[in-house]
Each structure stands twice: as C-alpha cells, then as structure tokens.
Amino acid sequence: MTEIKYLEGMYQDPFFPPFLVDKIKQCIFDTVQFLEQGNYDTEAIQAKFDEMTLAINALQDEFYENESELETGARDSIAETIIPILAHYKIDIDIEELLREREW
C-alpha cells in the first residue's frame, strides 16, 4: 500500500494536541495491521472498526482536558484517512456505517 497520510488535517491544526492525534493514529494503524493479515468477512471488518471507533471515543475526555475536542474537523480528518484505506483493501462498507459507533 502506498504510504498512508494519517490525520493530516488534525496534525496541521493546533487545536488538536499532537500527542492525542498520535493516539488516534495508533488506533487506525492497529486496524490497518488487522486488515493486512488477510481476508476477513464484512462482519469481522465492521467489528474491528467498531473497536477502533470506541477506542477513539474513549479519548474524548483527554481532548477536553487539553482544551480540545473531537468535532467536525476531527471527524473529517479521520474519514479522509480511512477512505483511502477502504479503497486499497477493496472494502465496500459505507464510511458512516463503518464509523457507526462514533460519538464525534
């Protein structure tokens, strides 16, 4: 896979603390590692993305504690990172469904 540009919008915006963006990046990276292991059915892929999304949700308090939050800019940056990953692995799940557990 070509190099993934993780969360460019969040890294470029000083509203988002880089150490917290790194935590989201790790959540996404772990999901990519899962996808690289082989072919999975749609249910397994959805379950992994649900797990990733719940882990990102769990970071919300840390964002608040650092005068930030997971909001529209974060949502867009996360989606812009994930959409090329879906295309690369030929995953045909709508991004809204894929991130159905999100609270941001």
What are these regions (language model features)?
Residues I28, Q33-Q60:
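Mature extracytoplasmic domains of secretory-pathway proteins
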Residues D13, F34-G38, L59-E62, P84, ...:
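Surface-exposed polar/charged interaction patches
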Residues Y64-W104:
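Amphipathic alpha-helical binding modules
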Residues L20, G38-I45, E67, E71-A74:
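Residue-level recognition of alpha-helical structural elements
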